[in-house]
Amino acid sequence: MTAPNESGAITIIMPRTALQRWRSLTQVGFFALFVLAPPLDIFRYDLTIGNFILFGHHWTLNLDALQHGQATATEAAVNVLLFGLLPILLIVVGFLVVAWRWGRIYCGWFCPHFSVVEIINRLMQRAIGKPSLWEQERLPEAQADGSVLRRNRWYLVPTMLAVVGFALLWSVSLLTYLLPPFEIYSNILHGELTRNQALFLLAATTAFCIEFLLARHLFCRFGCAVGLFQSLAWMANRRAMVISFNRQRGSACRSCNNACDNACPMRLQPRTIKRKMFTLSLIHI
């Protein structure tokens, strides 16, 4: 695809690669799963009944049977091992093995929080020329794919709508992981939220608004335990997948506007000492 630039010259716009399209699909799919898992009873914890619900079935340790004398201590211990510790251990080990080999692939390909980070980055860059309020300088309008992203102050409106909208969506979604989803939806639609439900939504929405607007990158880099353990597992593997320098295309860096630094949604600087990153966001920029 081609498009004229400011001087009238034709600029080649690189189409998205198959890998980039797959990444977008996995992000959208996992975000939808994050929102829809509670109402579809795929996974949630119901405080009203005191146990998890997994794929429509109650997932319990069956300790009530021990309290009522209907099971022995040995049977209760086996239930705790098989239905409590073992599934958690398998999930944790599997997650760390994937991170050991492919780095923070969950962050870049699945994490619903990081999907919001990228959307707000893009909107904020359109509004003020920077993907973060803390960025010192505006980024070049010329993008790595050859397109031009022009600044427009009117994009502050959709940026703020996205911040508030995603904050509210996250708050409601988290509440449905703890209480019956359709009860929450009904209470919101009819204005019948209980005091505790209203306080939770108000506090969570406010916190997410602040985080999405001011500290979304800081949370991912320093506050997310899931990201931290992925990084630790990845650093333990000397042969893990990394982003490295392609010497055959080294001459392209002479006319480059630091595209890899500008494209990084986490505001890292791959051209510095942290050049071997452990996500795939910079592939084919």
Predicted regions and their residues:
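Long, internal scaffold/assembly segments composed of regular secondary structure
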Residues: N257, D261-A263, R267-L282
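Membrane-embedded alpha-helical bundles of multi-pass integral membrane proteins
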Residues: T2-G250, D261, F278-L282
